[in-house]
A protein has these predicted regions:
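Generic helix N-cap/helix-start motif at coil->alpha-helix transitions
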Residues: 23, 36-39, 68-78, 102-112, ...
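N-terminal leader/linker segments that initiate helical-solenoid repeat arrays
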Residues: 21-107, 111
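Sec-dependent signal peptide recognition
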Residues: 3-11
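Solenoid-like repeat scaffolds
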Residues: 63-69, 96-105, 131-140, 167-176, ...
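Helix-turn-helix repeat elements of alpha-solenoid scaffolds
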Residues: 47-58, 81-93, 116-130, 154-164, ...
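Glycine- and small hydrophobic-enriched segments that form the cores of compact globular domains
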Residues: 116-192
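Conserved small-residue packing positions in alpha-helical repeats and bundles
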Residues: 82, 112-116, 150-151, 187, ...
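N-terminal signal peptide c-region/cleavage motif recognized by signal peptidases
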Residues: 15-19
Length: 236
């Protein structure tokens, strides 16, 4: 665990040692890797990791905001921007940057999903997902984040699709903050659908990996209802 955090700190040091006007996609990608390492430690309950996360999110946002539109509209930059936006970047600032980056390119449909997700317009996000169907090849490296966004967009309108998306996130990103979020949301779906097997599977995996997560209280808040649902549906 400490090795991962040390590696993240090394990446963060490189990020803060760079010029904000350098517009280096390599710097941004290094920063994103460091961010994800820190977030995975947050999910496991490592103290002080949240402060590192906030610093990296702020720095990466500054780099994007100091970049010209010509840089933002490049496919690598668009992909990295979508990744940052879905990784917890400030929603208002991220949505503005995504609007500036749009114009043309393979990632335009996927950027629309991210923009509506950031704006919390899940109806439009769901429509954008339908329009982007079959275009996932352009989202290499951010599939698990898009799976979370898709699942969230479908939560109120299509629980089976939402469940499928969150299950995909579990497969794509085991042992990460993405998995932690997906498990919490799948547990809620298990309760709503009275699916005891799904709830138990999520509860076992969550308790093994994320019991110390700062987000764990949200999971445990529905635990009693889940146990009651399981006891009503199984002989235990």
């Amino acid at each position: 665990m400490m090795q991962k955090l040390k590696a993240a700190v090394a990446g963060i040091c490189c990020l803060f040692g760079s010029s904000a006007s350098g517009n280096s996609i390599l710097e941004i990608q290094t920063g994103l890797r460091a961010l994800h390492q820190v977030q995975d430690e947050i999910a496991r309950g490592v103290p002080d990791a949240s402060q590192l996360q906030n610093a990296v999110l702020g720095r990466l946002t500054e780099i994007f905001e100091s970049s010209p539109n010509s840089f933002l509209s490049g496919q690598e930059a668009q992909s990295a921007l979508a990744e940052l936006a879905l990784s917890g970047g400030d929603r208002t600032r991220m949505a503005n940057l995504i609007r500036l980056s749009q114009g043309s390119g393979e990632l335009e449909p996927l950027l629309s999903i991210v923009q509506f997700y950031l704006e919390a317009d899940m109806t439009k996000a769901a429509l954008a997902i339908e329009e982007a169907e079959g275009m996932e090849d352009g989202a290499s490296g951010i599939e698990h984040y898009l799976a979370l966004a898709k699942g969230t967009a479908w939560l109120e309108s299509d629980l089976p699709k939402a469940r499928e998306a969150f299950e995909q996130a579990l497969l794509d990103a085991p042992g990460t903050l993405v998995e932690e979020v997906a498990l919490r949301r799948l547990a809620v779906i298990g309760l709503q659908q009275k699916d005891a097997d799904l709830f138990v599977r999520c509860a076992i995996l969550y308790s093994r990996r994320y019991a110390k997560s700062p987000f764990a209280p949200e999971f445990w808040s529905g635990f009693a209802d889940g146990i009651q649902m399981v006891s009503n549906s199984k002989d235990i």
